[in-house]
């Protein structure tokens, strides 16, 4: 599920941290499956996860200001 910045800005800091950790975990799973020689379940999934992580980090930085 894609999360847009607007939805992320409405989340609390704790929710953002939870979302970030779950995204990093799913990216790790995708990378490990590819490293073991398997084909990725969806070729664009890793890119999508990386972008979602970037969105979460951006919103977290915005909230610090």
Swiss-Prot record:
Classification via Pfam families = Ribosomal_L29
Any idea which GO molecular function terms this record carries?
structural constituent of ribosome
Protein name (Swiss-Prot/TrEMBL): Large ribosomal subunit protein uL29
Question: Which organism is this protein's natural source?
Answer: Picrophilus torridus (strain ATCC 700027 / DSM 9790 / JCM 10055 / NBRC 100828 / KAW 2/3)
| Annotated Gene3D superfamilies | 1.10.287.310
Q: Specify the domain of life of the species encoding this protein.
A: Archaea
Q: Which GO terms describe its cellular component?
A: cytosolic large ribosomal subunit
Give the family, as the similarity comment puts it.
Answer: Belongs to the universal ribosomal protein uL29 family.
* Lineage, top ranks: Archaea, Methanobacteriati, Thermoplasmatota, Thermoplasmata, Thermoplasmatales
């Amino acid at each position: 599920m894609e999360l847009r910045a607007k939805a992320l800005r409405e989340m609390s800091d704790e929710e953002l941290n939870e979302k970030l950790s779950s995204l990093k975990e799913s990216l790790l799973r995708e990378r490990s499956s590819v490293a073991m020689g398997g084909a990725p379940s969806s070729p664009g999934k890793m890119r999508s996860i990386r972008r979602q992580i970037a969105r979460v980090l951006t919103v977290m930085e915005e909230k610090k200001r």
